[in-house]
C-alpha cells in the first residue's frame, strides 16, 4: 500500500507573497498614477512641455495630463501668478479631489521672480495661496529637474499617512494676497539697495486679518478680499 505523499512547498513561495498595509497600498497606487493639471502662465511651462516628447517620456512615471481639475491629483504651477489670477488658481485647487499635491516650478512661481521687486500685481510666492509640496527653483528649470521633482514627490507620497496629511492641511493653511511694495529711489538706475529690497520675510508685520485659517471650506472670493 502506497503512502500518500504530500507535495513539498516550493521554496519560491515566500518570494511570491506580499504583506503590506492598506495605507502603503494606497500610497503605492497613488504615486504610480499621478494625473497632473498643467497650470502654466509663462516661459517655464515650455520646459515642461518638452517632457511629453520621446526624449524624456514622462509617461513611464504614470503621468497622464488632465484638462479638468476634478480629474487631477497634482497641479504644476509654472510662471508668474498675478493678483488677478490668484482667485482662479485657488478655485482650481479647491476643485481637485483629495489627496492632492502641488509642485511650484520656477523662480516666478516660488517667490515672484524678477517681477517681485517693482510690480504691484505679482504674488510673492504661490505658497501664499495654496500649500506647496515640492519647490523646483530655476529660471527656467530643466526637464531633468522636473523629473527629479516628480521623483521626490513620489517618495514623499510613499511615506505619508493620508489622515495626517488632511489634518495638517486643514489646521496650517493660511492665505493672503496683500503684499507690501516698497520702491527705492535708485531702482530705475540699476543701483539697487540690497538692504532695502531684500529684507527677511516676517509675518509679524502683516495684520492678522489678512490670514485665513483653513478650518472649513473657504470660497475663492473670500480669500482675496
Swiss-Prot record:
Iron-sulfur listed as a keyword: yes
Domain of life, source organism: Eukaryota
Catalytic activity: a plastoquinone + NADH + (n+1) H(+)(in) = a plastoquinol + NAD(+) + n H(+)(out); a plastoquinone + NADPH + (n+1) H(+)(in) = a plastoquinol + NADP(+) + n H(+)(out)
One protein family per Pfam: Oxidored_q6
PROSITE patterns from the UniProt entry: COMPLEX1_20K
GO terms under biological process: aerobic respiration; electron transport coupled proton transport; photosynthesis, light reaction
EC number: 7.1.1.-
GO cellular component terms, semicolon-separated: chloroplast thylakoid membrane; respiratory chain complex I
Subunit relationships: NDH is composed of at least 16 different subunits, 5 of which are encoded in the nucleus.
Assigned protein family: Belongs to the complex I 20 kDa subunit family.
Identification of the protein by name: NAD(P)H-quinone oxidoreductase subunit K, chloroplastic
